[in-house]
Amino acid sequence: MAERVLDWEGGGILSAVRGPYSRPPGSLINYELETMATPTRVQAPAEVTPTREQLIQAYRAMYMARRLDDKEVLLKRQNRIFFQISGAGHEAVQVAAGLVFRPAHDWFYLYYRDRALALMLGVTAEQMLLGSVGAADDPASGGRQMPSHWANRELNIVSRSSATGTQYLQAAGCAQAYRYLNPESDEVTLVTSGEGATSEGEFWEAMNAACLESLPLVFLIQDNGYAISVPVEKQTAGGNLAQLLTGFPNLKRLEVDGTDVVASYGALMEAVAYARQRKGPALVLAKVTRPYSHSLSDDERSYKTKAERDAEAERDPILRFPEWLVSEGILDRQGLQVIVHEVDQEIQNATDRVLRADPPPKGSALQFLYSDSVNPTSAEFEAEPHFTGEARTMVDELNLTMHEEMRRNSRMIVFGEDVADCSREANLAEVKGKGGVFKTTAGLQIKFGSDRCFNSPLAEAGIIGRALGLAERGLKPVVEIQFFDYIWPAMMQLRAELATLRWRSNNGFSAPVVVRVAIGGYLNGGAIYHSQCGEVIFTHLPGLRVVMPSNALDACGLLRTAIRCDDPVMFLEHKRLYREPYNRSQHPGPDFTIPFGKASVVKSGQNLTVVTYGAVVQKMLQAALQVEQRNPDTTIEVIDLRTLSPYDWETIRTSVEKTSRVMIAHEDCLSWGYGAEIAARIASELFEHLDAPVGRVGALDTWVGYNPQLENEILPQVENLAAEAERLLQF
């Protein structure tokens, strides 16, 4: 029975009928093009097909992929590995992709079923099995990730997490990177997934970005009909993803039988040629099978009928492709047997070796959470200020620092919502320009151009995801999330991707993105969605640096450190502090930096230590003055942490040992707030030095209200801070 290959491009429908594995040499294929109401006849160029050597290479990789799946199934049942998920049924389209794309030139965001593709790109059977046993020598993760999470820096196979759908946005950022690194390159980025993952909103954000920017990005969607147990008609409206994408401009769309190597090769050649010619992104929807269950944790017999499973078996490319090779005279059965024997022997030899491989060494668990080449907590980042000019507000210092760093580092780019001066460049002759809702990025687009400072769609996950892909290529994205209250759509990119990348890849990949976020209340009128804190959620993420300055000088030095360090940084900018007169500073110079993890003792004292940060620093200074006026023999020491992860334990310890009393104050909710961890550590490690219980002041355990009186009741005020300080001093 003939297989139908569909090609949608630019709103029209191109269709052709090809037999399974048919490849008439040098023939022309007639396509019928329907656009609007005017049908036209066009001819496509001669069909490009793999060579005999490529077809033999493809079969070898297909067979090896299936036998590796089978070997892992056996090893899992023997309790010699700990998880197994297969790519069975997907092999044909994957080997076709391996023939079309160029390892170490193109870039790859693979998913867990892409075993055959990874083999074609250069990952070996032994490397895959090292991942299966979780060996220290696993080149993808050093035993830190589940099997089938392939990564290889030399081959440009980027480390993937287990999260489905997050890869698309990173691939979009990666595809964008060539414009900065090598505009003449014809590189293409490939991102793959099953059809189920396209239900994630981040797929649609990535598709929108790819079409907006005409990125050289190829989406290979392998539709095996099921997302675990959910059939495609319950997953995708109409049951066909390609048809849903009709309205996306510049997008080439193709649908192909993904169990047919030759047809898949042709479709992918068209898609890749389109992207290499910089016409825009392409999507190939490959209909494949899944003859094995989702994973060894699943039993497909609980939701697939025998008839369904039998029909899938008939389309299994591992059975069909070798028969076609014989029928076409490409290989005889003896030649097939030689490949089978060689592959089986290679897998067995590799298995024997990896079962003797060492596990990750004890004591290595904390390695590679952060960069081992740039340490932002070191003395290297201690710099004396060289003040010039008039005193500036925090927002002005942040803006000037970004100007200086963009001048210094041509790989630094700034983007986010409303950060550009004006997306319509022609308007700049007549308008002042936006430059951020708080003006922190004003003038960056005008000074450095629209390629280096630009507006993004209103999509927080899209901002962080694209920044990840850009940073993975060596660029330095400094992105803005407009309000902390709206950061949550980006949470998967922040937690599952940005914070974990270096650790999960065993230092193979990194993404030193700086995420600038406006945070906090004390504004009057900000209410629930413009005044919240929640920094403790991000200090709980290993691999992420978290910074929160309280004044203009610190904002300058800490932002510069964030930009120059090699780790992802969450840079929290308190909105109330942007234009306060009391925290202004002269500019300290273009090389002024402040180390992370080094607190500032903003007021010395002998009787009580207060640990705080952000907008509460000034309120605590006011409270301390009141308490000292009422208690003339008392002095209070106030510590501004400045960075929340890491934090300066030594300064806290030294102060508490001196004062014997301590209070932690922050704007966020009291319960499970940032101060709880510090309080617990003080109680555990400094108990013998304490003359009073550890005190804490924070917001009420509710949301910030709109009415100013309500907001004042909810957030910590000077009187709350003073009252708790005096309570502790009475012990």
Report each predicted region and the residues it spans.
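Short helix-capping segments at alpha-helix termini
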Residues: S505, E628-D633, E685-L690
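Peripheral docking tails and interdomain loops at the edges
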Residues: E323, S327, G675-F731
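A glycine-rich phosphate-binding loop feature that marks nucleotide/adenosyl-phosphate handling sites
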Residues: L285-Y292, V340-V343, S364-V374, V514-A518, ...
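Flexible loop/turn segments at secondary-structure boundaries
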Residues: A116-A118, T198-S199, Y226-S229, V262-S264, ...
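Thiamine diphosphate
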Residues: W8, L28-L190, L212, L366-P568, ...
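Glycine-rich ThDP/TPP pyrophosphate-binding loop and its adjacent helix/strand module
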Residues: N156-Q348, R356, T539-S660, A665
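Intrinsically disordered, glycine-rich low-complexity segments
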Residues: A2-G11
